[in-house]
C-alpha cells in the first residue's frame, strides 16, 4: 500500500535534488494513483513543504545532531514533510509521527525509523527554541531563499516584508469560463446549484474566484471544456489583444496553452491562430488543453527567437509573447520556484526576453 508521506518525499526530492518542476514531479506520482483523497494529501504535503521549505530546513538543521549524508536526500525530504505536518497542518501529532515512521520503512530506511521518531517528537518538545531559530534568519522567517530576500528588500524597501509574506499565502482557485459554452452568470448559477461558492472577478470578464478550492474534476463541466483554471491577471492578456474577426494571431511561448485557448474562446472567427513553443513535452499540453475545450489551432514546436525554423512568411495582426521570466510573481502558486530559480537566472532571462522581442517585431503587420 502506498504511503502518502513517502510519495510526497519522493516528489520533493525530485524538485530539490533533481531540479524538476513540481508539476512534473507530481504528475509522475499522481498518474499512478486513483484515490482522490490520497492524491489530494500528496499534493498538500508537496506544495506545503516546498512553500515553507526554507523555514522547515532551518528547523531540521537545529533538530539534527549531524547532517544527513547526500545519499539520504529522500529521508531528509521525508523529515521536512513530517515537520510541515506538525507545524502547518491540523493532522494529529501522533498520526503525523507514526505515518512518517512508516514512510521511512517504505523508503527502505528501516535504520532511520528511530531518527524520524526522535526528530519529530523533539520538534514538539523544543517549540520555543525553534521559534528562536526561525527568528534569527530572514530566509527562515519569510521562507524564501536568502538571495531573493535581499533582492526584494533592496527593490521594495518599504514593502519587502508584505511582498515575501504574500508569496507564502495559499493562492485562490480562479477559473476562466468558456464563453462558447456558458456565460459567466450562467456558470456561476451552476456552481451555486452545486453549493460551490464563487465570485466574479472585477478585472477579467470571464473570471471566477472560488471561495474555497475544489478538485478540478469536481467542477461542473470541466472535462467537457466549460471552464479552465487560469489566474485573473493571465486572463487580461487575451482581452488586451483587441481581437477581431479575420485576424491572424501568433501565440509565442504558448505552452501550456491557457492563453491560446482564451484567444480562441474570445474570437472564434479568427483567420488563424499559430501557437509555438520550444519544449516538445509542453507542446503536448497545448494539444491536451485544446482537445478538452474542443478548440483547434496550428500548434508548432520551435524556438520563437528563431522564426525561420517555423514561420510561413506571412505577418500576424496580433502577437502574444509570454516570454520566459523569473516567475517570482507567481511563487505562491509555484513554490518550487524558490528552489529552482538562481540569481544568475535573472540576467539570462532578461537576455532571452530581449532576443524574443527582437525576433517578434518583424513578424507583426505594420
Language model regions located:
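S-adenosylmethionine
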Residues: 1-366
